[in-house]
Amino acid sequence: MYKLLLSMLLVSLSTASVKADALHRNPYQPANSANMQTFGSTSIPIGAYEYCKRYAKRCQYETKASGIQLTRNVWEKIVDVNVSVNSIIRPMTDMEIYGIEERWELPADMGDCEDYVLAKKLELSRFGIPPGALRVTVVYDANDGGHAVLTLVTDRGDFILDNNNNRVLRWQEAELTYVKRQKPGNLLHWESLRPNS
């Protein structure tokens, strides 16, 4: 019994430590909120802008739902898509693939972080998750490098799908600094995840 209590305490402390680290990176986000707070409109990333110029129909879509109800079936599909896309796509930079610094593209078998996000977004929308619940999100990773993840907006909070992690995490648990994300239903319009940016 003592070992069980001790292990439960250690898990609790490690989870609290991870949350504290993530929240330390995002002091303007409310610690107890299940969803990230937004701070108004902001600029579109150049990669998203150029992607939308090439594929206009992929960037604007009708969406009534800006979030989803998180059921066991939906959760299992989300985890499955995150793991399968992470394992199928080989990580390579845009410079290695296209010879340019930044290009967002649906990947065939290789890509960088934005490409993983676009692939996950496509797979989850095919499953029936409304596009408004799937938000491309620009962040800084644990090493302060520019990065992109997919945020899933649900009735139980915002969850992060990251090509660097097979686990789907609550936004507070991911060791990321949140910068901005697309608005529901339109990859051309973005909202800030921190004030004055």
Model-derived features: positions:
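N-terminal hydrophobic alpha-helix used for membrane targeting or insertion
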Residues: 8-10, 109
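A structural boundary/capping signal
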Residues: 19-197
